[in-house]
Amino acid sequence: MAKYLRSNDYLVIKAHGTVDETSKMIFTHKQYSFARYNNASFYKLLDALILTHTFIFLGCGINDPDIELTLENANFLYEGCLPHYFVTANGSISGNMQKVLLANRNIEVISYDNVSGNHSELLEELQELSQKVDSKRIELAETSTW
């Protein structure tokens, strides 16, 4: 992961595994502790990235103990940093919990409709966002107004 720190590429971090290798996925408290101990350098890089990049949490929960600790440490040690974002279906996180996430972890919640029940609306929204970002990049490159 370190080689990507100086890269202009976007990075998808699958901190606790991927469905492509389910045997390496992390679910239990013991597995979290073991991973934190055996991958200490990863968590140091994660600490740095939290301070220098904007994170969008997508397809995960809000109760990951390692991520909670990392975000809370950064929030209280370095006040005034720009927020990170957590994307979830409407109604899955209460208004009070959203306030707690912002106050303690500097996370703003972005909600989307999930009428279908299979999150297809999220995919549509992400595709639309991608098109808008591409258009804006072209506009900025042509006008040099950044």
Predicted regions, residues:
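SIR2/sirtuin-family catalytic core signature
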Residues: 1-9, 20-23, 43-146
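Active-site-proximal helix-loop elements at catalytic-domain edges
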Residues: 9-32
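Active-site glycine-rich loop that binds ribose-phosphate moieties when present
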Residues: 27, 31-44
